[in-house]
UniProtKB/Swiss-Prot annotation:
Protein name as catalogued: Probable nicotinate-nucleotide adenylyltransferase
GO biological process: NAD biosynthetic process
Keywords carried by this UniProt record: ATP-binding, NAD, Nucleotide-binding, Nucleotidyltransferase, Pyridine nucleotide biosynthesis, Transferase
Highest taxon of the lineage: Bacteria
Xref: InterPro entries: Cyt_trans-like (IPR004821), NadD/NMNAT (IPR005248), Rossmann-like_a/b/a_fold (IPR014729)
EC number in record: 2.7.7.18
Record's function text: Catalyzes the reversible adenylation of nicotinate mononucleotide (NaMN) to nicotinic acid adenine dinucleotide (NaAD).
Length: 211
């Protein structure tokens, strides 16, 4: 049977319970063999993070210590330059070979602007895309992203039939937690306990992050 690997990229500034639950639910719902969380160094399409790449990677490692079903991929942090998904997928394809099904997971908000990504037309030559429905966001009714979806939309079962090339839309359970709100809580002197893993909250306190 074709091996499958899920990839969940993000800034993770900081990693929180919502990230972890979503990654685990995607792995289980799609019946993936593995799921890697892949923090970016410098996000190409977002504001600069409040914590350094090293600090965000450390928080992610602390969070995943209690979840053996999830793992971390630090290739984008190690690049020490702007992160482009197409570069990471190209590296993974070279490492894992042509048979492994790569499944890159992203939100509706990110997918809606996919045509602004670096070399976006190459993404489906390297991986499948799983688009996670997010409340308040929708895919444009016209334009290149809508055309791409119409040409490549498929069912979850197709993720094992080919190594790349399909777009699957999913509406998993989403916890209403955001990294922005967590940073705002900390900045206001309040505790984000139970929104982030205890080990992450302890590290944030030690490093005096987001104050």
């Amino acid at each position: 049977m074709r091996p499958t690997l899920g990839l969940f990229g993000g800034t993770f500034d900081p990693i929180h319970i919502g990230h972890l639950r979503l990654a685990l639910e995607l792995k289980q719902q799609l019946q993936l063999d593995g799921m890697r969380l892949m923090p970016c160094h410098l996000p190409a399409h977002r504001d600069q993070p409040g914590a350094s790449s090293t600090q965000r990677a450390t928080m992610l490692q602390l969070a995943l210590a209690a979840c053996p079903e999830l793992s971390i991929d630090l290739r984008e942090v190690a690049r020490a330059r702007a992160s482009y998904t197409v570069d990471s997928l190209s590296e993974l394809r070279a490492e894992l070979g042509a048979e492994t099904s790569l499944v890159f997971c992203l939100g509706t908000d990110s997918f809606a602007g996919l045509d602004r990504w670096h070399r976006w037309q190459e993404l489906l030559q390297l991986a499948h895309l799983v688009v996670v429905e997010r409340p308040g966001w929708d895919i444009p009714s016209t334009g290149p992203v809508r055309t791409l979806l119409a040409q490549h939309q498929g069912a979850p079962g197709q993720l094992r039939l080919a190594a790349c090339g399909s777009i699957v839309r999913l509406a998993p359970r989403l916890l209403p937690i955001s990294a922005t709100e967590i940073r705002q809580l900390i900045g206001a002197g309040q505790s984000p306990q139970f929104l982030v893993p205890d080990s992450v909250w302890q590290y944030i306190g030690q490093e005096r992050l987001y104050r």
